[in-house]
């Protein structure tokens, strides 16, 4: 058995503690408990004052260092009399001897939490104010104590104070416990450093304009929930949250229902984004990350849901519903009669949640509007891919910039349907063809490895509704066969990016069919 293993269960008594905290939550109870257990407390600045004001004995750090706070408090603990007491490995006789010669006492416990840098940035504070909240001494003490975990226990959050007092009463922390605390401490400083580095890179020293994506990417995520399983029962899964991110599905409030699954989250995220791709009242129904139906309405959210559901009622069974509008009582009454896994919305009218809750298992989520800009990460073997979010903000996403390749200009109603179809394509896995009528998808061809099969699938799903409808393709038609599949079924107008070396042949096929064909010059692949 190694010495490390042999000491894992041995406790190290806590006789001397260093406390320096910005967040004073629980501080007095902690200090009082330590004092009553006979622990000597050394503390800094406002922390020492807070403790002393309650009549608890405390030694100000300047009494230990023999040096006052300077530079508006920027230098308090950066001193050998502090850091030698933190870094001395008391298992080593030579370290103990060195401390004795210098008249330095070791610390057994360090309790530190850091300046609120991220909160200051989020408050809209000035650059100088944010810089002042970059903690230097705090992380230095935390890292020193965590490195020296064989001799020192370190606690970085108030929710750990009860554990400190329990340890003091029972003889201290074991080595195994100190290792866990050290790991949490380094995680804490890593999160802090990533926040500072990311802010500096984006605010103080941004990349050159030509370099729109950063040379360095840092991020931290904390586990928020352990999920039952992943995409399949044999896969483990968990939900992690980014505390600095725009509040998204990971931060949604669940108002009712069973716990969310991995697949629930992926489908809800796809549905949520699809619904907010449109300015009008919109409902999107998603299954396996693809739309069963998307619809907009100028009448009501219930009308939008009815139209979206009618696109493919069979596939919508067990689907995920999202809307960019408040869920009405009328919509809730309809949804309550349909097997639905998840519904997510920015608001619910009074009574709507109660109606939906008739279904015991339906998951009802309240979520903030998703971001329209930013970047997306996708892990790959050995690294990750980063791209700008496809936000439907290209020039070609505005019908004003479309080119009429052939046929008569579309009337306002047809053009509105073409715009809706084009924006709906973004939510469909490529190759994607969407057939639309009256502000609703009536046929969706998704995820096919060639475009003609996507067109066939969209026509098949639309059935008789395809006659007189319009269609959109997320990428250009490489051959006329996909377009011909749509026109032969009765589609009267089509929008696609264009850009194929055979654009002229495709346009000729459209002209022959007597339809209007628009080119966007933009593309919306989704993989």
From Swiss-Prot:
Protein name: Bifunctional purine biosynthesis protein PurH
Coiled-coil residue windows: none
NCBIfam families assigned: PRK00881.1, purH
Gene Ontology CC terms: cytosol
Keyword vocabulary terms for this entry: Hydrolase, Multifunctional enzyme, Purine biosynthesis, Transferase
InterPro entries assigned: AICAR_Tfase_dup_dom_sf, Cytidine_deaminase-like, MGS-like_dom, MGS-like_dom_sf, PurH-like
Pathway: Purine metabolism; IMP biosynthesis via de novo pathway; 5-formamido-1-(5-phospho-D-ribosyl)imidazole-4-carboxamide from 5-amino-1-(5-phospho-D-ribosyl)imidazole-4-carboxamide (10-formyl THF route): step 1/1; Purine metabolism; IMP biosynthesis via de novo pathway; IMP from 5-formamido-1-(5-phospho-D-ribosyl)imidazole-4-carboxamide: step 1/1
EC number: 2.1.2.3, 3.5.4.10
Location of the MGS-like domain: 8-156
Reaction equation(s) it catalyzes: (6R)-10-formyltetrahydrofolate + 5-amino-1-(5-phospho-beta-D-ribosyl)imidazole-4-carboxamide = 5-formamido-1-(5-phospho-D-ribosyl)imidazole-4-carboxamide + (6S)-5,6,7,8-tetrahydrofolate; IMP + H2O = 5-formamido-1-(5-phospho-D-ribosyl)imidazole-4-carboxamide
Gene: purH
Gene3D superfamilies xrefs: 3.40.140.20, Methylglyoxal synthase-like domain
Pfam families, A to Z: AICARFT_IMPCHas, MGS
């Amino acid at each position: 058995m190694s010495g490390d293993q042999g000491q894992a269960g041995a406790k190290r008594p806590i006789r001397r503690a260093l406390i320096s905290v910005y967040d004073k939550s629980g501080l007095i109870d902690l200090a009082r408990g330590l004092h009553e257990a006979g622990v000597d407390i050394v503390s800094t600045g406002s922390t020492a004052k807070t403790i002393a004001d309650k009549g608890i004995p405390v030694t100000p750090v300047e009494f230990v260092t023999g040096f006052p706070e300077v530079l508006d408090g920027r230098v308090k603990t950066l001193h050998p009399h502090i850091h030698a007491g933190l870094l001395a490995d008391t298992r080593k006789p030579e370290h103990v001897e060195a401390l004795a010669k210098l008249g330095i006492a070791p610390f057994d416990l360090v309790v530190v939490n850091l300046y609120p840098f991220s909160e200051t940035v989020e408050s809209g504070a000035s650059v100088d104010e944010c810089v002042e909240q970059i903690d230097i001494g705090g992380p230095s003490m935390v890292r020193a104590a965590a490195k020296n975990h064989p001799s020192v226990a370190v606690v970085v959050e108030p929710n750990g104070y009860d554990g400190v007092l329990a340890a003091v009463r029972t003889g201290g922390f074991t080595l195994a416990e100190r290792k866990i605390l050290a790991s949490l401490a380094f995680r804490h400083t890593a999160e802090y450093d990533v926040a500072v580095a990311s802010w500096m890179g984006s605010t103080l020293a941004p990349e050159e304009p030509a370099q729109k994506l950063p040379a360095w990417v840092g991020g931290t995520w904390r586990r928020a929930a352990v999920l039952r399983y992943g995409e399949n029962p044999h896969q483990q899964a968990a939900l992690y949250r980014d505390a600095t991110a725009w509040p998204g599905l990971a931060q949604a409030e669940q108002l009712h229902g069973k716990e969310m699954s991995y697949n629930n989250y992926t489908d809800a995220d796809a549905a949520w984004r699809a619904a907010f791709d449109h300015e009008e009242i919109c409902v999107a129904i998603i299954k396996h990350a693809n739309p069963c139906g998307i619809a907009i309405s100028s009448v009501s959210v219930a009308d939008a849901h009815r139209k979206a559901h009618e696109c493919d009622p069979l596939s919508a069974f067990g689907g995920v519903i999202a809307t960019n509008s408040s869920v009405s009582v009328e919509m809730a009454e309809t949804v309550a009669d349909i097997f639905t896994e998840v519904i997510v919305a920015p608001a619910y009218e009074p009574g709507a949640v109660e109606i939906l809750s008739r279904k015991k298992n339906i998951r009802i989520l309240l979520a903030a509007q998703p971001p329209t800009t930013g970047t997306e990460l996708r892990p790959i073997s050995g690294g990750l891919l980063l791209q700008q979010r496809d936000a439907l903000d290209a020039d070609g996403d505005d019908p004003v910039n479309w080119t009429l390749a052939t046929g008569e200009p579309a009337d306002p109603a047809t053009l509105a349907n073409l715009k809706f179809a084009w924006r709906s394509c973004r939510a469909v896995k490529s190759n994607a063809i969407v057939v639309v009528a009256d502000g609703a998808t009536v046929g969706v061809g998704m995820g096919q490895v060639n475009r003609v099969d996507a067109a066939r699938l969209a026509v098949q799903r639309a059935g008789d509704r395809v006659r007189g409808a319009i269609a959109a393709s997320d990428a250009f038609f490489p051959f006329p066969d996909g377009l011909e599949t749509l026109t032969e079924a009765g589609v009267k107008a089509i929008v696609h990016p264009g850009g194929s070396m055979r654009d002229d042949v495709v346009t000729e096929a459209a002209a022959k069919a007597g339809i209007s064909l628009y080119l966007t010059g933009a593309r919306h692949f989704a993989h």
